[in-house]
Amino acid sequence: MEGSTGNQSVKEVAVVTGGNRGLGLEICRQLASNGVTVVLTARDEKRGAEAVSILGSLGLSNVHFHQLDVSDPTSAVRLADFIKEKFGKLDILVNNAAIAGTTNEIGNPEIFRQEVAGMDRMERVKRMREHMTEPYKQAEECLRTNYHGTKAVTKALLSLLQSSSHGRIVNISSRYGLLRFFSAEEFKQELNNIDNLSEQRLDDLSELFMKDFKDGQLERRGWPTEGGFSAYKVSKAFMNAYSRILAKEHPSLCINCVHPGFVQTDMSFQVGDLTVEEGARGAFMMAMAPKGGMTGGYLNCTEFAPFV
């Protein structure tokens, strides 16, 4: 179930979801390199253990592994029990685990990368979309993972974060989660009106989105449809709103969202603009932010920006 590469003497403890590869693995590396004890989580135990070994080969002996399926609330509870027993508290939670909500027909990724080499970002993204579909099942899984999964993990670990003298939550978001992608003005206003928005309302909107998706009513209702990735955009917008609600309800915690940029990961078929080292900077910055800093905010890479 779990494994580690070393000591428990480091003062601060962090959990990183989806930490076995790409951006998540790099966030783990940067945190561990700066003296934080890291609990790297992944759904696949073998891949998670291999990731810990990779970091161990870099001389990072302060990384532990624990299995976590963010879409399973009982899995999040097991992780919380492990953290409580081993460390007694949690200082940093990085909710990184996410899926695109699409199926791809790109075929050989290396050939695709060669085909799009030299194209600008918008053209590369357009070519990616041409090879993707958004079936209902994948859209449902996307909301379950990116929005509901983030909530489940956060709720399971919340009391441990409150046991820290400086609890921080960093939710890895996306430019696609900005409210500008909704065509319905009422959705934009409601999701941006945090004083009157509730978690229950977000859950209700999640159900409405899936119903409209199944009924073919996304465009008519005003959900994000232009350019594709509808479920991904909605899931990140809901995650952003949930983060802001949580920040309002728990002012002692520092809770922020970070868009890492268009990063060279498996999700982008390695055709992004930024390396994982560059993409992880914003998340690392907020994870290591001093007490009393920004909460309820959004970073575009490393710069504060609006949610709209």
Q: Residue spans of the language-model regions?
A:
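Catalytic loop of short-chain dehydrogenase/reductase
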Residues: I99, E105-L143, Q162-K248, H259, ...
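Hydrophobic positions on the long internal alpha-helix
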Residues: V94, G149, V153-L157, L161, ...
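C-terminal helical subdomain
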Residues: A152, A237, C257-T265, F269-V308
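A conserved hydrophobic alpha-helix of the Rossmann-fold in NAD(P)-dependent oxidoreductases
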Residues: G48, A76-I83, S268, F304
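Canonical Rossmann dinucleotide-binding motif of NAD(H)/NADP(H)-dependent dehydrogenases/reductases
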Residues: E2-A42
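The beta1-alpha1 cofactor-binding region of Rossmann-like NAD(H)/NADP(H)-dependent oxidoreductases
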Residues: E45-K46, Q67-D81, Y136, Y147-T150
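Hydrophobic/aromatic anchor residues within beta-strands of the central parallel beta-sheet
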Residues: V63-F65, I255, G296
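N-terminal Rossmann-like NAD(P) cofactor-binding module of classical short-chain dehydrogenase/reductase
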Residues: V15, V39, D91-V94, V170
